[in-house]
Amino acid sequence: MKLYKLNTHTRGCNKSYDADLVMNLKDHPNANVGDVVEIYAPDEENGTHLLLQITEFNGSCGRDVISIESGIANAFKMRPYSNVVMRIVKPADVALDSIEITFKDQYMGRSEMWRLKTYLTDTCVYVNKKIDYNDMQIRCQVYEMWSQGERVASGVITEDTKIVFRSSTSMVYLFLQMSSEMWDFDIHGDLYFEKAVNGFLTELFQKWRKLSCNHEVTIVLFSRTFYAAKSLDEFPEHMRDCLQQDYKGRFYEDFYRVAIQNERCDDWCTVLGQLRKLFTSYQATVLRYHERENMKIPPATNSSATQGNFLEVLNISLNTFEKHYLDRTFDRTGQLSVVITPGVGVFSVDRELTNITKQRIIDNGVGSDLVCVGEQPLHAVPLLKFHNKDTTLTSADDYSLPHWINLSFYSTNKKIVYSSFIPRIKLPLFGSQLTLHDGVGDGEGEENERHFLSCNQSEYKHNSLFDYDAYDEQIFQPLPAQSTCSLQRVVRAKKTSVPSLETYAYRNNDWENLTPTQIPAMRRKMSDPDIHHGTSAMLAALQPDTTNLSESLASEKNSRRTIVSIAPIVRPGRALINPFDPSQVTIKLTSNRRRWTHIFPKGPTGVLIQQHHYQAVPAKPTQAGQQRPLQQTQSNNNNDQEDYGCENGEQYDRVSSHSLLNKSDSSQSFVMGDEPIDFFKRRQNSPMNPQPANVPNLTATQAKSYLWGATGEQEWTPAITTVKHLRPIVEGEHHHLGSLEALRALDPPPDAEAGGGRGKIIIGVDWKSLTIPACLPITTDYFPDKRSLNNDYVISDYTLLPDDVNHDYAQSRAVYRKPLSTEEVCKEIVSQRLAQGFQLIVVDEKPPTASGCSSGSAVQPVKLSRETNKEYLLSIGRIFHKISLSGSVITVTGYRPRHPYPPINVDYRYRFHAPQHETYEISGVNFTTEKLENFNWNHMDLYICTRGDVDYPLMESLKYWRYRMYLLPRENIVSKIASCQRCDIFPDVTADNTREQVEDFVRLIEAVSKLKRQYARKARYLASLLQDSPIAHITKRRHSTSIISRPQPNQGLTNSPFRERVGSNRLPEKRPSINVRPKLENGRIPRIFPATDAAAAAGVAARDDQDDGFPVDIKFSPNATLPEIFEAMKHPVNGVGFFSQTQSLPSCTFVSYDALMWLKTRLNNGRHPLDLLEAMRKERMICHASGDWKKPVVPGFVFYYVVQQDKNAKDYAPPLDDYSAFVNEWLEIEFQGCSFLWHDEPVTTPVPNFLRDSPAPQSWTETSSNKRVYRQSHLEIDVNQKSDRMEWGHVKHHTVLQPRFAFEIVVEWVTSSGPIVADLIGGWMRKANQFNFLVSVPADPMAEPFTKKSDPLRGPIFIPLCTTFLPNGAALFDEFPEESRSDRMLFFQEAILGKFGFLPCVLEKKYSVGKDLPKEYQYVHCTGNMFALIRCATNNYQVESPILKEANVTRCVYGHTNNTNVPKKVGFLWAWNHMIPNKKWKAQTINNSADGELFQLKMLKDFREFCSNSDQRLSTFWTQSQELKRRAQKFEFNNNNTEENKMK
C-alpha cells in the first residue's frame, strides 16, 4: 500500500494550486482528469475517508506528494505533512443516494435546479463544499449526503442521485392558533401559549439565527369566535357583513391579527415580546369587538383547536403563494406555511374545503407544517374529522389522514417528578405474539401462527375490533344489477377497516379454505380518491418471493382480477377510517402521494424516512442482504421494557437518523456485524451488492398499508411518537463549526439511551423543514401503468418542427437572432413544465426476477439507438406529459384524466387586523382549485419555438414571471425629513427639476436600450484635428457627473453590447481660435462647447454661451430656410447627432427630443421646433425610423432618420418598412407636459388646480383616451452572455413620460433564469441610481379587500380627511358649480399628497359593463416606500367579487360579496411597499428622534396629523392656496390693464 505525503494549499494564492486536489501525473500514469480518489490515514482505515475528484495535474507538485486545499484538510482532520493512502475508486462504489444543497439570498427557479443537477452529475462533493455555477450565477453549498441508508461526508453524484434543494431565504407564514386551549395549562404547569412562544418559537428563532437564515416572515394570530344565537335577527346590523354559519347552524366569525408582515430580521427574538403583548389582550379584544353601548350582542366564545379555522388558514397562505410569479423577487426562494396549534392534531373540517386544500397544496408544491404543542394522542395524527351532516344515530364519523401535512409535536425538556415514563399503548390484535420473538424456531413459529389463523371464527365473535353494524349492512345489502370490477390501481399491502368476519380471519397467510365468494370488491371512497377498501392484503400474500414494488403490484392486480371476475360483488357499508388502527385501510398509490417523496433519505432498510418520526420498536431481521440480524437485547429484569407485539412479518424501520449514528450496543441501537453504522466509516466495496439500503420498499410478507406520513412508506403504529429529542440532530452545526467534528457531535453518548428506558431519546420537531425548508423536488417516481393510461386518461399529442418554424419566422424579424436548435427547444419545453410545477419522472430499471412477473408500475424508458433521440416523462397532479425528441421532430403527448374533479369555489369572509391598522377590517376571498389541464401548453411551446415572436404573445393564463418597477426622480428624502419635524416639506415642481428629470430619463433609456454615446467615427475632414489638447481627453453629455475616457482613434465599430452613438455630442480635439476654460457652476462641471465655422454656408452666427447639452456654435437667422436648417442638423460634428449603424436602425438615426433641444438653442425668432420637424417630415427630409411615413413627429425618445442621404454610401442602412417589427425591438416613449423645455411659454403665477376656474386634467390619459397606456418590446436578458441557454424576455413600459409622474417598467419572462434576470435588472438599478431611482413595486400595491388577486392578509390603511375646518361650518368649494366639486376634492387631496412627496401613477382605466366606476388616482412616494389612493367619494358604487362559473360553496349568511359598500368617507388609502426588503428601510431610522422612529412610520403619523387638521395645518394649507389664487388674479388683472393701456 503506497503512501503519499500530504501537503495543503490555499486556493487563489497560486494559479498552479487552484483545485481541491493537486497531484503529479508521473505518480499516477493511469489516472485521468475526472477520476475519483479516496484518501485516508493508513492507521485509520475505518476512520474518516475523503473522496476528491481529479480536475487537473500539476508538474510542480513533488513526487509521492499530494496537496489538498487547506479548508478541506482541516474539516476532515488531515494533518499536513502526514502520510496518507490514496487510491482510485469507481464512482459507482461511492455513489450518493441523495444529497441536500442549501442556498441563500437568491432566486433559483425549478428550471435552474434541473440545470444545476445536470451540471453536478458525475462530480465529487463533500460536506460544506461551495458550488459556484457560473453559467447560471448560482451559489450554493452541500449540506448533507446519504448513501446506503446512512449519512456520509463525501461521495459522487450520479444520474440516480436525488438532489434536494433547501433555501435559507424563504417566504414563511407562521400562524399561531389562538384557540381556547392557549389559555390552558399543560402537564408541566405552563400555559400552552408560553409553550408555543417561549418554547417552540424561541427555539425556532435561535436555529434561524444559528444557520444565518434570512426568511421573509409573516406572523399571524388567528381564532374562531362562536356566537350563541339561533337566528340572524339576534345580531345588530353592523355585525352581519362577516357572519358565517357552519353545518350545525352555529354563527361564527374568524379573526386574524397580523403581528409581523413580510419582515426580515437578524434576531427574531425581539418579536417574542410583541407576541406576548398581543396575547394579553387578544381574547378580550376579539370576544368584545362588537360591543356597543345600549346594544345587545349574543354571547361570544372562543372555539377549541378542533373546531377552529385550520384549513382556512392554509388556503389564505396559498392565495398569496400561488401568485408568486406576479411579485417575483430575486433574493428568496421557497414558500412555507406553518400552523402552530395548542391542540393535538385533530380538526373538524368541511369535506369540500379539504379537497380544495389538498389539491392546492400538492399542485402548488408548498410546504405545509403543523406543529402541535399539545400532548400527542394514542391514535394517528394529523386527523381530519369531516363534518357529519347526517344527524341519524346510525351515522358514523368519517376521518381522513392527510399525507400532505408535515406533522411535528413539540414538548419541553421538563421532567415530571413522579415519572419519566411516556406510555405508548397498543392493544394486541388477537393474542400474544411472544412466540415470534422468544427464540422459538421458525418452523414452530409458523405452525403456531397457522394454527391460530385456522381456528374457528366463532371464538373471536366478541372481539371489540369488529363493527357489527357495518358488517350487517354489508351482508344484507342487495346485490347490484350488474357485477363490475374496479380498474383503479391498488398498491402496497392492503387491509380493510370494515372487513367481513371471513375476510378478517384469513387476512394473513392461510388460504386453504378461501373461496372467491368471500371476497368483497373494491369500493371507491368519495371523500378521498386515494383510499380504497378491499382484499389486496390476501392477494399480495400469494407472491411470497416478490422482490420489488412494481412486480408485487402487477402480480397483485393480476391475481385480484382473476378472482374478482367470477365473484359476485358484495359492497361493504360505510367505508370508514379507524384512527386507532389506520393500517386496516387500503391506500391507492397516486402521483400526489409521491410528489414530495424524493426529499426524504432512505433508511437502512431502503424505506424513505422522516427523521423526526421515531419508532420505538426495533426492526425485525431480514433474511437476505445482511451480514447478521440486527441485534436486540432483551432483559426480563427490566420492568420498564414493554412488548409492543409485532405482527407476523412486520418489519419496523427505525427512522431516527440518531440510530444511524449510535455506537451503543443497547437494545435501541443498530449494529451490523461488529461495526456500528457511522457515516464516516469506510464504505462497502460496492453499493450494487444486496445491502440493506437496497431492500425493496415493500415485501409481500410484510402485508402493510402505508396510510400515514408524508413519505408514503411509513406505517403508523402506536409505537411511533414525535416527542422532543433531547439533542436535536438536524441543526446543521457544521455550517458554523467548519469541520466534520460537528457531524461527529451528532452521535449521542454511548449510554444515552441505556439508562432511561425506552421511548426517551426521541425526535419530535422537523427542525430541518422549519429552518431550511426544502423546495419541491424536481423528480418523482410514479407513472400510471399502460392499462390505467388507456382506461382512465384522455390522450392528446402534437408535433413541433422547430427548424421549419425558425426558417419561417427568421425572415420577418427586425433583428436576426440565432434560433434555438431542436434539442435546445426540447430542453426548454421541459424547463417550462418544471417551472410550472411539473416533475421529471425517473423510473428505475429493475432486472427480471425469478417470479417472472412483468412490471406494471410505470412506462419503462425507451432504449434509444441514436443520441438525438430523447424522452422525458413529467407529471403534476393527475396530468402527465411525455416529450419525445426524434431527429428534428418533437412530439408532445399529454395525458389528462378522463373524469376530472369538478371545480369547487369557496367564498370565505373574515376580519383581519394588519400592522398600523386601527380595527379589524372585513375582507373576503375565494378558495378555488385550478384546472391544470386547461393550461395552453401548445401556445407556450410555439412561443418557445418562435423565440418569443409577436404571433404568440405571453398571455395572463401562461402565468409568466414579471418584475414591476417605478422610475422616480431622485431626491435625498430621508435626510430632508430627518432635519425637519414635519414631512410636508416637498416643494412644487420647477422648470429646472423637470429638465433634469427628463435628461436623466433619456440617459437611463439609452442604457436599457444598449445605446451609448461615445466616440465611434470621425468625419474624414476632421482627421487632421485628432491631436492632443488639454481638454481633448474628456467629454461630457448633458448633466452627467461622470467623465468618459476618449477612445482610441482606431476604435471604430466594436463588438460591445452597446450600440454606439456619434455626432455632435463630442469635442473637436483642437480649436486654436477658441479658449475654452471649464468652470464649476453650482458644483457641477459645465459642458464645453467649442465653436466651428462649418455652418457658415447656412448664414449663421457663432455662439458658445449656451449650456443645453449640445455644441452651440450657430444661431439661425430669422429668415433661415427649412433646407438650411436641415443641412445644419445633418452636420457630422455640430448636427443633432446620430447613432452608429446597428441592426434594425437605419443610418443617420436620432431621437426627436435631441432634435427639439438642438433647434431650441438655435432659433431666436419664436419659431416652434416641433413645427419645424413636422415640416421636415412632410417634405420627406426625415421619417420615423421604421420607414412609416404616416407617423408624425412626436416629442420624446422616439426614433427618426434622415431620408435625404447618400444611399450609395458604404454605411447606408435602409429602414425596415415594418412598424410593428420595429416597435417590438425598440423602446419609444413620448414626452408630455414638458413642452416648455423646447419652446418658450409665458410664465404664469401657479394656481392650485383645485381652485382654478377650469381644472387641468389629472394626467395625459384623460385627454388622450385613445392612446395606449403600455407598450411591450422584446428584451435580450443575457446581455453579458453568461448563460448556457438562450434567454429572452419582454419589457412593458408606459408609452408617455410626464414629469413628476412615476414611469412604470415591467420585465416579463418565461425562458430566462432568475439569477440572469436579477443581474440585468441590478445593472439597470445601478445605472438608474446615478440619475433617478428605480424601485420595485407589487403588482397590486393597495391589495384592497374583495379583489381577485389581492393578498388576503394585506389591506390599505384608511386615513380620513377632515372637511369641516372652514369657519362657520362652511363647505369646501361652495363657490364653484356643484358638478365640479367632486373632482375638485380629488385635486385637493392630490395637492396634499404632493406636499408629502407623492407622485401620481398612470394606470389603465377599469371598465365595467353597465356600471359607473368611480374616478380613482394612485400615487407612490418618491422613496418608493408607500402608496396612496384617492377615490371619488360621491359615486354610489359597490365592489364585487369576481364572477366565477364554478359552483359556489359559501357559508356567508348575509347576502353576497357585492353588498359590501366601499366607505363613502373622504380620505386616503395608504399602503406599504412590501417589495422593498424591510432591512433597507429599517436602516432609514430618524436618528434625531427620541425613540429612533422609523422614517415610514413618521411619514404615516405626520400625514394622519395633517389630515386631521392637527395644529390647524390643514386650514393653513387651504388659506395659503386661496392666497395664491388671489395673487394670480391680481397679476392677471394688472397684465390686462397694461395691455389695454398700450392699445390706447
From Swiss-Prot:
One of its GO terms (cellular component) is Seh1-associated complex. Residues 1058-1072 have a biased composition (Basic and acidic residues). GO terms for biological process: cellular response to amino acid starvation; germarium-derived cystoblast division; germline cell cycle switching, mitotic to meiotic cell cycle; meiotic cell cycle; negative regulation of cell size; negative regulation of TOR signaling; negative regulation of TORC1 signaling; positive regulation of autophagy. The keyword Cell division applies. Residues 615-649, 1037-1072 are annotated as: Disordered. Residues 623-639, 1041-1057 have a biased composition (Polar residues). Pfam families: DEPDC5_CTD, IML1, IML1_N. The keyword Membrane does not apply. Disruption phenotype: Pupal lethal. Under nutrient-replete conditions, larvae display a significant increase in TORC1 activity, indicated by increased phosphorylation of S6K/p70S6K. RNAi-mediated knockdown in the female germline results in a large percentage of ovarian cysts delaying mitotic exit. Instead, cysts undergo a fifth mitotic division before meiotic commitment to produce 32-cell cysts with a single oocyte. Double RNAi-mediated knockdown with GATOR1 complex member Nprl2 in the female germline increases the penetrance of ovarian cysts displaying delayed mitotic exit and producing 32-cell cysts. One of its GO terms (molecular function) is GTPase activator activity. InterPro entries: DEPDC5_CTD, IML1, IML1_double_psi_beta_barrel, IML1_N. Keywords: Cell cycle, Cell division, Meiosis, Mitosis. An essential component of the GATOR subcomplex GATOR1 which functions as an inhibitor of the amino acid-sensing branch of the TORC1 signaling pathway. The two GATOR subcomplexes, GATOR1 and GATOR2, regulate the TORC1 pathway in order to mediate metabolic homeostasis, female gametogenesis and the response to amino acid limitation and complete starvation. Belongs to the IML1 family. Component of the GATOR complex consisting of mio, Nup44A/Seh1, Im11, Nplr3, Nplr2, Wdr24, Wdr59 and Sec13. Within the GATOR complex, probable component of the GATOR1 subcomplex which is likely composed of Iml1, Nplr2 and Nplr3. This is GATOR complex protein Iml1.
